[in-house]
Amino acid sequence: MYHGWTDPQVSPMLSVTYYDNVLKAVGKEKAANSIALFMMPGMNHCQGGDGPDTFDKVKVLEQWVEQGKKPAQIIASHMTNGQVDKTRPLCPYPQVAKYKGTGSMNDAANFSCVADAR
């Protein structure tokens, strides 16, 4: 699953609540084999917005289902005028992408997925 944090049409918290309810219903360990949630900072409803909104969804699913490689992160990109101007890791909820403190803030390589400090 993925959902944009700035979705103006469907509250992002609906996806968070659904995901949390699945974990409660079947247990974290069992659910981990079949569900993951990636929240996308700055993405509107399915696409658009200031944040990275583009990644190969089919490839991610194929690697997980067919090869058993559950994504630890997904690299998404943002484009302006047909050019990639930003990449960012999408982290499995509840992790978030944290800037490492050096390098371009528009380069996914300068971020790591960490537990949300809230």
Segments (PLM) and residue ranges:
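C-terminal His-loop and adjacent cap/lid subdomain of alpha/beta-hydrolase
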Residues: 1-118
